[in-house]
Amino acid sequence: HSIMTDIFPREFTIENYQMVFEKSRVLKPMLNSLKMSLMAVIAGLIITVPVAYVVTKNNNIHNRLAKFIIMLPWSMPASAIAVNLINTFNQKSIFAFNKSLIGGFYILPIAYTIYALPLLFSSNEVAMKSINLGLEESSRSLGAGKLKTFYNVIIPNMMPGIISGAILVFIRTIGEYTMSALLYGVYNRP
C-alpha cells in the first residue's frame, strides 16, 4: 500500500491511518518535518524576542536597520531564499564552520528560521509595544537588574505574542514545500 498515490483518495479507511503510524517510511518524513519546524520556531524566538525588545525601546538608525533586515525575508519568495542559501553554503566557509551545509541536516532548519523571522518579529514587536512601561520601571526601582527584569517581567507579559507567533510560524513552516524541495538531502527529507 502507498499513501496518496491517487490525486483523490478512493476511501478513507483505518488501514491508511494505521499505515501512517506503523511504517517508518511514511512516519519518518512527518516526524522530520515536525522536528525541523520546531527547531525553526525555537531559533527564531531566540533571535526575535531580544531584537523586538531592543527595537521597541530605542528608535535609532541601528535598530531600524535591524528591523529592516529581519523583515526582509517577507518580501522574498521561498525559492529565492533557498537559492541564496544554496549559493552561500554550497562550499566550505566560515559561516558554516568550514563545512558545506548543502545536503546536510541543518540547511532546512536554517532556511525555515530565515523564512519565519518576519512573522515572529512582528508578533513579538506588537506584544512588546502592548506592555506597560511602568512594569519595567517598577521592577528596576525595586532593585531588579535589566536581565532579571527582562526574564521575570518582560517575557511573561510578551507570552501571548510569543505563543501566537510560534504557532503561526510552526504551521507556516510545516507546510513549506518550495524550500524543502530545493534544499532537502539524505538527512533531512521533509
Where would I find each of the regions flagged by the language model?
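A short glycine-centered flexible hinge/capping loop motif at secondary-structure junctions
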Residues: L142-A144
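Membrane-water interface segments at the C-terminal ends of transmembrane alpha-helices
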Residues: H1-I3, Q18, K23-K129, K146, ...
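Short alpha-helical segment that forms part of, or immediately flanks, the ligand-binding pocket
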Residues: E136-E137
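Short hydrophobic, aromatic-rich alpha-helical segments embedded in or entering the lipid bilayer
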Residues: I7-E22, V186-P190
